[in-house]
A protein has these predicted regions:
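Short coil/turn connectors at secondary-structure junctions
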Residues: 1, 37-38, 70-72, 98, ...
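A secondary-structure boundary/capping signal
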Residues: 8, 77-79, 104, 138, ...
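Cysteine-nucleophile active-site neighborhood
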Residues: 48-124
Length: 197
C-alpha cells in the first residue's frame, strides 16, 4: 500500500517515518501525477501560507481537489487542516485571505493557543479513532463546521475553553495537532483502515 505525504514544506519526513513503521510505503508528493500512485494523502503541518502558495505554484490545487472529490482520503494535520478549510482567520490579525483548498466545510482560527512557547501536549478523544496523544504547536482550532462536515474531537484548554481540534467530512479529516511528533499511530492506522474499506 502507498500513502502520499505532501512534501513541499513542513514535517513530511516525520509522517513518512511513522507510515513506514506500519509497513506502508510513503510517497513524497511534489507533482500532481504522483497522486495516481497513492491511496490516501496527508497534508502535513508546517507554515500554512507557504504550503498554500507552493500548492498553487506547483499546479497541485486542482489535482488535490479532484483527488479528494473522487473519495480518496485526505488528512490535514495542523497547517494541513488550515489548507483544507473553507474559512481561515488568525487570532491576532483576523481574516487572512491566504490560499487554501477549501475542501472542508470548516472554519479555523490560526495560532489559537498562542505563540510557539505556549505549545503543549494533550490526550484528545477523536470519534472513530479513539484517544490520541497530540502535540499542539502554534495550532489552529476548528471554530465551526457546517454540513456535511462535523467536529469530531474537542479539548478543554485552561485559557480558551472547550474548542474543536478534529473534524471529518466524508473521507476528509482535519486535525489541529501533530500526531507525528508524539508518535501516536492511531491516526495512521485509521487512514489505513479507510483505504482498505
Amino acid at each position: 500500500m502507498k500513502i502520499g505525504v505532501l512534501a513541499l514544506q513542513g514535517d513530511y519526513l516525520e509522517h513518512a517515518q511513522l507510515l513506514k513503521e506500519l509497513g506502508v510505503e510513503a510517497v513524497y508528493i511534489k507533482r500532481s501525477e504522483q497522486l495516481r500512485e497513492v491511496k490516501a494523502l496527508i497534508i502535513p503541518g508546517g507554515e500554512s501560507t507557504t504550503i498554500g502558495n507552493l500548492i498553487s505554484q506547483k499546479g497541485l490545487s486542482q489535482a488535490i481537489m479532484k483527488y479528494a472529490e473522487e473519495g480518496n482520503p485526505v488528512v490535514g494535520t495542523c497547517a494541513g487542516a488550515i489548507i483544507l478549510a473553507k474559512k481561515v482567520v488568525d487570532r491576532a490579525v483576523g481574516e487572512t485571505g491566504q490560499p487554501t483548498l477549501g475542501l472542508m466545510n470548516i472554519a479555523v482560527t490560526r495560532n489559537a493557543f498562542g505563540r510557539q512557547n505556549e505549545s503543549f501536549e494533550a490526550t484528545v478523544y477523536v470519534e472513530d479513532i479513539g484517544e490520541v496523544r497530540a502535540a499542539f504547536i502554534r495550532a489552529p482550532v476548528i471554530s465551526d463546521a457546517w454540513s456535511p462536515a462535523r467536529i469530531t474531537g474537542y479539548i478543554d484548554h485552561p485559557a480558551i475553553g472547550r474548542v474543536g481540534v478534529a473534524a471529518k467530512q466524508g473521507s476528509l479529516i482535519a486535525v489541529s495537532f501533530h500526531p507525528e511528533i508524539t508518535g501516536d499511530m492511531k491516526i495512521y492506522e485509521y487512514i489505513i483502515s479507510l483505504v482498505k474499506k
